């Protein structure tokens, strides 16, 4: 951790200790949440997405302003099938990256495009119009194919004398070589990782905060530095930091919340301009949707099929 980050965390911790949590809603005005709104949004996420659950965490680290059994949200064993760098070109080709906030070159990607791998394969598929289908190539009917009604041509197994029909020198029985299956080169195997994702309430920034705990294919804990391989290169080392988890032991990679409120405010403004009145209990669905641009290959559940809010039209 660099000195500036250490100083900021020390300052942030001091402010959190001497100030109380937000109690007045500023969801639409600032894109932030009060503690009660965070719990409300968390309850809705758990209800709509059963893979998410509330956790109490380490008793010594519990925050008094949160319910003891609802200290943070977590979803476990989330698959990550490939590294973030492998899809960067796909996103660019799909033209799906849109900066929600690009002030001071600190923008966030609102969404991302779809991979184009399948499209390439489809380009190589022949058209049905190009196939020359004629009557001569059609499959014969079953009776004709197997000899029709001419049963007399089919030999009777009872006519075979086993002693006279044994082939003693069948080449197939003398085959001395056989095929051996070899494992592919390890360098060509894409290792599937899994992640535990947790969401905490950041009292200083008054927004949710995502934390990542990664595991390799053998369920061995990933070093936080390796987690960066599964973070969009636009955000790795810039908006993703390695810090102490507020409720769990050890260092964890985390998406820093310094811009969360501003980004959420812009998303809310866009929805309202389209005649949709966002509801605060849907906050985490929107939040996790824009988080997908930071960790595009970690396939967590945030339920795309949901009502963003009540339409004013």
Swiss-Prot record:
<feature type="compositionally biased region" description="Basic and acidic residues">
    <location>
        <begin position="114"/>
        <end position="123"/>
    </location>
</feature>
<dbReference type="GO" id="GO:0005737">
    <property type="term" value="C:cytoplasm"/>
</dbReference>
<comment type="function">
    <text>E2 conjugating enzyme responsible for the E2-like covalent binding of phosphatidylethanolamine to the C-terminal Gly of ATG8. This step is required for the membrane association of ATG8. The formation of the ATG8-phosphatidylethanolamine conjugate is essential for autophagy and for the cytoplasm to vacuole transport (Cvt).</text>
</comment>
<keyword id="KW-0653">Protein transport</keyword>
<dbReference type="GO" id="GO:0019787">
    <property type="term" value="F:ubiquitin-like protein transferase activity"/>
</dbReference>
<keyword id="KW-0072">Autophagy</keyword>
<dbReference type="InterPro" id="IPR007135">
    <property type="entry name" value="Atg3/Atg10"/>
</dbReference>
<comment type="similarity">
    <text>Belongs to the ATG3 family.</text>
</comment>
<dbReference type="GO" id="GO:0006914">
    <property type="term" value="P:autophagy"/>
</dbReference>
<feature type="region of interest" description="Disordered">
    <location>
        <begin position="103"/>
        <end position="125"/>
    </location>
</feature>
<feature type="active site" description="Glycyl thioester intermediate">
    <location>
        <position position="258"/>
    </location>
</feature>
<protein>
    <recommendedName>
        <fullName>Autophagy-related protein 3</fullName>
    </recommendedName>
</protein>
<keyword id="KW-0833">Ubl conjugation pathway</keyword>
<keyword id="KW-0813">Transport</keyword>
<comment type="subunit">
    <text>Interacts with ATG8 through an intermediate thioester bond between Cys-258 and the C-terminal Gly of ATG8. Also interacts with the C-terminal region of the E1-like ATG7 enzyme.</text>
</comment>
<dbReference type="GO" id="GO:0015031">
    <property type="term" value="P:protein transport"/>
</dbReference>
<keyword id="KW-0963">Cytoplasm</keyword>
<dbReference type="Pfam" id="PF03987">
    <property type="entry name" value="Autophagy_act_C"/>
</dbReference>
């Amino acid at each position: 951790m660099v000195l500036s980050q250490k100083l900021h965390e020390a300052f942030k911790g001091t402010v959190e200790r001497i100030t109380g949590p937000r109690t007045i809603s500023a969801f639409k005005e600032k894109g932030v949440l009060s503690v009660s709104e965070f719990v409300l949004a968390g309850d809705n996420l758990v209800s709509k997405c059963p893979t998410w659950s509330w956790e109490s965490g380490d008793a010594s680290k519990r925050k008094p302003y949160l319910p003891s059994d609802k200290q943070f949200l977590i979803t476990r064993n989330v698959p990550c099938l490939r590294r973030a760098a492998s899809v960067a070109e796909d996103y660019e080709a799909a033209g799906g990256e849109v900066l929600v906030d690009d002030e001071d070159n600190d923008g966030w990607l609102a969404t991302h495009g779809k991979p184009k791998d399948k499209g390439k394969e489809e380009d190589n598929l022949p058209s049905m119009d190009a196939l020359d289908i004629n009557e001569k190539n059609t499959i014969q009917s079953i009776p004709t194919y197997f000899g029709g009604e001419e049963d007399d041509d089919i030999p009777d197994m009872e006519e075979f004398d086993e002693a006279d029909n044994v082939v003693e020198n069948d080449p197939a029985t003398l085959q001395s070589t056989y095929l051996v299956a070899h494992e592919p080169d390890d360098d060509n195997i894409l290792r599937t990782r899994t992640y535990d994702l947790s969401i905490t309430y950041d009292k200083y920034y008054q927004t949710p905060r995502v934390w990542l705990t990664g595991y390799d294919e053998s369920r061995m804990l990933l070093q936080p530095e390796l987690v960066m391989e599964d973070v969009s290169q636009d955000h790795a080392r810039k908006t993703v930091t390695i810090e102490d988890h507020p409720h769990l032991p050890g260092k964890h990679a985390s998406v820093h919340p310094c811009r969360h409120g501003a980004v959420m405010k812009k998303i809310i403004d866009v929805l309202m301009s389209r005649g949709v009145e966002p509801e605060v209990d849907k906050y985490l669905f929107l939040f996790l949707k824009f988080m997908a641009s930071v960790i595009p290959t970690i396939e967590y559940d945030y339920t795309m099929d949901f009502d963003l809010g009540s339409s004013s039209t």
